[in-house]
Each structure stands twice: as structure tokens, then as C-alpha cells.
């Protein structure tokens, strides 16, 4: 065989192998990933195909286990909204950090909903009292276990709870949805306790902690529905998973949290309560929703979801802060401009 002919054959073989490998790699890259969650404890990338987001909940498992789904019985009815229709994009990799933001919070965490890793984290696995952020789980359990048209009665026990937000009195009767709105918008402790007592406090707490386990929130515990107890604790990594779950599966809860004000009607007297949101970020057009929290032990907490002009969603977590709103905005701006 002539030398020139031998070189030509070798080039053809090498080119064929290269094209074949490139084709395989391209197929692997383009394989759809409809939902992914990085479990806080094991950093496992979870894959799940679903077309009925409202009718299924996600069970998070380790990498060597198969993904499980469990059928959720809806108390509300109505059409479900598929995750696929919302168009979850391929996960992106966070850009390299150029400099750290100046923050005084005990715990700070920011991560794009579809990013594999946070762009900034401080104390991400440290357990911390989350205060009224607890009410997001209270709302979730109330939506899943209390029928939509249920009338919630405010008892003396409910009204005796610390705090007066919502201006409720003993004997008030409201529809469940209105009580949830008051709880999320003005952070009413009375409303949270009234919801829990509808099912019974022990059963309600059981449902809250079972839901945390189901979602893979391994470092999260709940002791009451209001968040007043120091034992309502979580981590930034767990809160990221929880907020992402609400965003994908229960966006209606976050929609309530960004309302500037709500009007709810007492059913016995017809009295209308006008309630304003205590979250300063609801005036921002890019704010999707979230929840404030404060106790003396926890200091100022804030869990937030933002959406930029390209419809990219970002979760920001600030715990143990002296100025939660300022530090949340500072961290989000740093993330967007780095």
C-alpha cells in the first residue's frame, strides 16, 4: 500500500470515531430533564417525568434508588397544571464568583432554580429557627387536607396566640382560603393556629413533619403551625428544595404571598377585613413570592423567589439578619450582576 493511501484511510477512521463520539455526547446533552432537585443531604440529582403536577408529589431518594411518585388525593378539584407545559429549561451552571457580597446575616444562600450549585452560600447546612417561614408549610398542609369550602372558626385558644395580626376576635368565621390569605399576607399567628385546630394540632403537626420527610427536607422539623416555637428549624439547603417544590407544584401559594393587600369577609356579620402585606418586596415587579419570619431567637428571616427579564427564577434565603430586605436585594443584585 502506498504511503499516501495509508494516511488517507487513517484520517477517515479517526474522523468517523470523532463524529460518532460527538453524536453520542450531543444526545446525552439534549436528553430532557423536566424536573431536578439537588437533595441537600446527598447532592443527588433527581429526575422525574410528570404531566400532572397537581396530582403527584415528589419523593426524593438517593442516587442508587429508583425515583418514586405517590398519588396525592386532591381536596380541591379543578384542572391540574403540568410542569412540562410550564417549560422547565435545561439546568444551567452558575458563573464563577468574582467577589463576595457584603452580608451580616447568619445564613445566606442564593441559587437559580435550574442551577446545579448555589452562586453563594454561607452556613448552608446550619439548622436555624425559621419563625414564620413555617407558615408556608402550614398553608401547604391546609390546602392538601382541609376541603376548600370549610369554614374556620376562631376559638379563644386561637385568639390567645401571641400577636394580633388580622384583628380577629373569638367567634369569627371565615372560609379556609381567606384564613390562609390572612396568614400568608400579614403573617397572622391566630390564623395559623385556627387552621391547625381544624384538623387537631397533633394531627396537623404530624402532617407537616411527614411532608417534610417526603420532600427530602432531612434537617427540617416543625413544632407548631405559627412558627413561634424555636423548634421550627430548617437549613438553607432544605428551604431551597421546599421553595422550588412550591414554585413547581403549588404556585398558587406563592401567588398569595405577593399580594399587596387582601380583603376577607367574616361570614357571620359580613364584616370585611382589609389586610396589607408586611413584606416590603411585594412592590417589586420581579418578586414572585416568599415569606418573612421573625422571633427574638431567629432574628429576621426571609425566603424569596425572583424572576428576571429572561424568565429565569432565583431563590434567595436570608436567615438571622438585622435587615432581611436590604440583604436579600443586595444578594440578588450581586447574583444578577456578577
What are these regions (language model features)?
Residues 153-165, 229-230:
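Acidic helix-start/capping segments at beta-turn-to-alpha-helix junctions
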Residues 144-157, 250-258:
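Short, well-structured active-site flanking segments
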Residues 161-197, 273-289:
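Conserved catalytic neighborhood of penicillin-recognizing serine enzymes
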Residues 2-7, 23-107, 200-338:
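Penicillin-recognizing serine hydrolase domain
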Residues 7-21:
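Hydrophobic membrane-insertion alpha-helices, especially the h-region
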Residues 101-105, 124-127, 132-133:
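Extracytoplasmic Gram-positive cell-surface binding/anchoring modules and repeats
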Residues 114-124:
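Short, conserved catalytic-motif segment at the N-terminal edge
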